[in-house]
Amino acid sequence: MKMILSSCDFSNPNSKQVILDNLDKKLCECKVLFIPNQKATYEKIHSDKYYDRLIECGFGKRENIYIFDESESEKFKNLNIDIIYISGGNTFATLNKIRKANFDNEIKKYIKKGVIYIGGSCGAHIVTRNIEHLLKLEDNYINIMDFNALGLFDGVIVPHCEANEYTPELREKIYSELLKEKKYNVYKLTNAESLIVTEEKIIKKYRK
């Protein structure tokens, strides 16, 4: 199992380099299943939008890129892939979308089989123990009541710390409160930091 979790995945040069340093092969050779956030529509999924974005990130051939469509979730089981990638978005809505498609267990199966998971912000939260602390940071407009996430990462994350555009004082307060509760292992990340998670250890990385 290997998961690369960060605030900004490919949109920050430091976290992007950590991803590149921890893959089993060159990014351009990897086959990837990309799961878009809650804003994805049928039209966007079946357009060039996400393909162009992933190629810009460094993924290679279009035929090596799979864009998840929850209306056809069966098609995305048992793929021959190297990476599952979930980026930013509304965590509550994205987790709900994955659950409704009954794809949460499929993600777990892929990761346990050795597929590398890349999660940025929302994507990082998806594999943690719980997302209830995000009620202070994101709009739970779909009113989900089950805040347990996939539980593949033994802890919770407070991302985007120290970034002025992401209410750093509030994030520091949430981090301190979570530490006092002692319910979960708590990790905070700046926009440049990443966590490399394997079955044996968790490594915090900052790559210049």
Where are these regions (language model features)?
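Ordered, amphipathic secondary-structure segments that act as subunit-interaction surfaces
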Residues: 79, 83-89, 93
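N-terminal beta1-alpha1 cap of cysteine-dependent amidohydrolase-like domains
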Residues: 1-83
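Active-site-adjacent pocket-lining segments in enzyme domains
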Residues: 86, 95-116, 123-208
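Short, flexible loop segments at the rims of nucleotide/cofactor-binding pockets, characterized by
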Residues: 8-12, 62-66, 94-97, 136, ...
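Glycine-rich beta-strand-to-loop/alpha-helix junction loops that act as flexible
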Residues: 7, 87-89, 120-122
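Short, conserved acidic/polar surface loops in the N-terminal third of protein domains
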Residues: 44-45, 77-79, 94-98, 129
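Short, glycine/serine-rich, charged loops/turns that create anion-binding
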Residues: 10, 39, 90, 131, ...
